[in-house]
Amino acid sequence: MRQILIVLLLAYSATSLADEAALFKQANFPVQWNDGSQVMPRKSQIVLTYLWADIYAAALFTQPDITPQQAFNEQRDLRLELFYLRDLDHSDITDACTTILKRQHSVAFLASQQAALKKLQSSFGDIKRGDRYALDYDPKRGLNIERNGTVIYNSQNHELAKLYLGIWLAPEGLPEKLRQDLLAQRQ
């Protein structure tokens, strides 16, 4: 019985890795991001799975000479792309974000960002399978939110940018292993 369990676990692990590769292929993240003024290589990519359901694939791009962690900590140029693998209701997304942000920040800080956060979250609606969102941060321009290649939101509020990117890149956001994988500089 024990041997059967081990074989099944190994088979599941191999299938999971193969499935992840197929999901990355489907997401088709570029090896580098070029916005016309700079080229940022893809540093990492992950797949978020919740209760055996694949939710999205994500890729992180930063300048070549810094780590993803430095880019986030120092608020340098970075781009986080999300390719959605299933439909999601807007209310489910905002509820999940609110839960994470409450874990990460004080009530007072969240209250100071509430109006800006509400405006950001109202910029997008329900997500459909195949939608591609990007959180693109440039210290000079601020944070752009893109949906399928079109900018749908911009804010020059640097605290809001760090707050929202922190859902994926700060502790207490993503499951820790996924967060570390996203910050790990692996393609």
Segments (PLM) and residue ranges:
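Positively charged n-region of N-terminal signal peptides that target proteins for export
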Residues: 1-4
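N-terminal signal peptide c-region/cleavage motif recognized by signal peptidases
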Residues: 11-15
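N-terminal structural module
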Residues: 19-73
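Mid-length scaffold segments of soluble, non-membrane domains
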Residues: 65-140
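Short strand-turn-strand beta-turns centered on an Asx-Gly dipeptide
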Residues: 147-149
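Flexible glycine-rich active-site/ligand-binding loops centered on an Asp-His dyad
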Residues: 152-178
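Cysteine/selenocysteine-centered motifs that mediate thiol-based redox chemistry or coordinate metal-sulfur cofactors
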Residues: 177-187
